[in-house]
Swiss-Prot record:
Record keywords: Cytoplasm, Nucleus, Protein transport, Repeat, Transport
Annotated source species: Homo sapiens
Function: Functions in nuclear protein import as nuclear transport receptor. Serves as receptor for nuclear localization signals (NLS) in cargo substrates. Is thought to mediate docking of the importin/substrate complex to the nuclear pore complex (NPC) through binding to nucleoporin and the complex is subsequently translocated through the pore by an energy requiring, Ran-dependent mechanism. At the nucleoplasmic side of the NPC, Ran binds to the importin, the importin/substrate complex dissociates and importin is re-exported from the nucleus to the cytoplasm where GTP hydrolysis releases Ran.
Signal peptide (residue range): none
Record's protein name: Importin-13
GO biological process terms held by the UniProt record: protein import into nucleus
A Pfam entry, by short name: TPR_TNPO3_IPO13_3rd
HEAT-type repeats, residues: 24-54, 56-88, 95-135, 142-179, 194-231, 236-268, 276-325, 330-372, 375-438, 440-476, 487-522, 524-558, 562-600, 603-648, 676-716, 720-754, 761-803, 815-845, 860-893, 897-931
Entry's localization field: Cytoplasm; Nucleus
GO molecular function terms attached to this record: small GTPase binding
Family of this protein: Belongs to the importin beta family.
Phylogenetic lineage: Eukaryota, Metazoa, Chordata, Craniata, Vertebrata
Domain named Importin N-terminal: residues: 45-111
Amino acid sequence: MERREEQPGAAGAGAAPALDFTVENVEKALHQLYYDPNIENKNLAQKWLMQAQVSPQAWHFSWQLLQPDKVPEIQYFGASALHIKISRYWSDIPTDQYESLKAQLFTQITRFASGSKIVLTRLCVALASLALSMMPDAWPCAVADMVRLFQAEDSPVDGQGRCLALLELLTVLPEEFQTSRLPQYRKGLVRTSLAVECGAVFPLLEQLLQQPSSPSCVRQKVLKCFSSWVQLEVPLQDCEALIQAAFAALQDSELFDSSVEAIVNAISQPDAQRYVNTLLKLIPLVLGLQEQLRQAVQNGDMETSHGICRIAVALGENHSRALLDQVEHWQSFLALVNMIMFCTGIPGHYPVNETTSSLTLTFWYTLQDDILSFEAEKQAVYQQVYRPVYFQLVDVLLHKAQFPSDEEYGFWSSDEKEQFRIYRVDISDTLMYVYEMLGAELLSNLYDKLGRLLTSSEEPYSWQHTEALLYGFQSIAETIDVNYSDVVPGLIGLIPRISISNVQLADTVMFTIGALSEWLADHPVMINSVLPLVLHALGNPELSVSSVSTLKKICRECKYDLPPYAANIVAVSQDVLMKQIHKTSQCMWLMQALGFLLSALQVEEILKNLHSLISPYIQQLEKLAEEIPNPSNKLAIVHILGLLSNLFTTLDISHHEDDHEGPELRKLPVPQGPNPVVVVLQQVFQLIQKVLSKWLNDAQVVEAVCAIFEKSVKTLLDDFAPMVPQLCEMLGRMYSTIPQASALDLTRQLVHIFAHEPAHFPPIEALFLLVTSVTLTLFQQGPRDHPDIVDSFMQLLAQALKRKPDLFLCERLDVKAVFQCAVLALKFPEAPTVKASCGFFTELLPRCGEVESVGKVVQEDGRMLLIAVLEAIGGQASRSLMDCFADILFALNKHCFSLLSMWIKEALQPPGFPSARLSPEQKDTFSQQILRERVNKRRVKEMVKEFTLLCRGLHGTDYTADY
């Protein structure tokens, strides 16, 4: 078959291949791909074959690769190449060759009907692609023609083979449509055409499915074909007969999975809710599966119960609103709801004995939303019917959330335990949501059950039952304000009565107390009921996460009521810290808890507690500072510094972030004298410097030191002022010796908080000039090895311009060198560094008028900046960064318009810049668009996105849709 040759480069293959795209070379490359043990050779072969598939020669070798004497792998490649040529390069096929191409594909499909199935499928996909490209004008009755041609009696292939080939073709046609690259307007036309053609497909499918003589393989294929077609949003009423046939096929174990898929796909179409009469006919069909469902559950047949549950949930979840509206059919819908309830409460533990119940959870959200969306009168009626259902749901969910016996749980794999944990979180979310429907009565219900369980003397209760009820409370209290609930005092009273003999139960008790910490803040008299439990649990490593996080919540929420317990809390915490019971992260949380606790004490008390709390660590740090650096003492140093920084993160006597009401703040006198954190920092400052002197070349230790001061600065704000001069001096020495990003980040914090204060400007200016000078030297030596430093440096410069532009007025600051280094940073491969550099320029350019040195350097070197930006847009930088470069263009246009209008024309003049794919007209249009837009930043971003796609040859491709 003749083919018009494609233009060179149409395939996008890049440089000319070393080998010609011939049948022989393709076969050799395929052999290399499948059988060569060398991975590099495989990759080369794959790359070459991808080029071959899109080459003009593919039209010639594809047909030859389909010859009967070739092995299936080679035939498959030939069929795939045909599909790629037809689907991606349709415009290269002359219209007068459509018919011969169609005929050849039909011939090949007929031949492969009794051959390799994978090759047959690829050929069917190729013909489907051709049909979609020709419909509706060039091939108006494509589907009907396919059916007619394959039903012809004169075919050499047996009837069953032809039937299966036709069904394969009809199955892949809608699938190919869903993934096709058809333009949007064509997609609409073809969808309409396919909807009409459905009339040629469904009668055939019905006939084949209902014929007793149809073999199982044919009926299986019919169901898959139906499943594929319903996703074209075929009207549900047109599918009635096939859906009923699919329900009947559920009794056949071989057809069960395909039937489920077909029914679920048909029911789940968004358009299906319009066909209420059909939906109502489906309810009895679904309810008719209940006996099969019960049998499956009884026999442990998880596949069958899972499939039937999917069908029930698909109908209920997708159409609850439409079915609720049919008031006269309320009983049949309620029966469906109860069937789904059975699926939610299916016996056994998830995920070991069953995997079905999790499918139903979203249904309960949907049903509740739909009920609550009705107007008040109608809602009241439905609430009357469905509130008892939702109370039953709570019981079912809490039963499903119960842990298995300790013995059984011990046999579960770690993966099964993790799946069960996630399942319980999903149940927790559902319970929290159900609270909206049931309100305070739900908490009363849970409390009554727990009370009866704990006070009953008749029978011993299982810890699992207690744990599940507490878990229900915790789920609701964590996210919903229960402060006005009248059952919480009783619950707090019940908690100490729980006999805790199990880690899971103890964990849930802890998390429940934590969830009630805000309530405890409003009812401080109850703190003493639960605090001893929490402090006792701190000593158990198995309860590490729950006990520490609960103590942290109590200390944060109730700190003004904790002074009477402070000594005990500090003593217990010190004890567990010294015994090293907890992992590092929990130790850090514990220090944060103590920071909250100490914040509410008198200054003298804080200092006393701080002394006893951190003295052992200071002594340990003094000892470590004398030792020769090694990996083990490094870990100890980082741990101690981490403990201090976490303590100082939350120790805030000025209550900057406090949202408590005035009366509670008045409990504390206004603090006099220096801040306790500053007192401690000044005491340990020399020691920290000593540690630093030995560990200056270790980024982790430097980072840990900087973290102490950075977190203290963020918490203390102005109270940190006494430390500013000595910290600036220390940072300067640190950074001069070995530059580290963390030192720059801390400098940025100091600039942000203190640079605007005249008293602190001199030391901060000196530090700023020093780190700038050191970093500029680093740029001369090779900054590419330090993207983190460059990133932090750019952020520091931007902060300086934003907070205190006067820092750029100093004659000792080489603004020109800073500007050039920032331009260089724009070309880094690391996205965060590029982003930070763009941020610097968007802060710098608006200062052109007010800071003389900035205006001068922009005038001299601004063209260099523009070229770097255009190079990035032209393809040098990631497309995800285009908004950042657009911000620079916008700033240039807004603040340096006359310069930009001259530079942009000059910069875009050279052919091939910033991309060889651009025409002079496209470049001219872009420059005019940019220069015109000085107000709307969003429009500039859109222009840049459009232009970068043109530069990269991606405009009008599939990439554009996701961009």
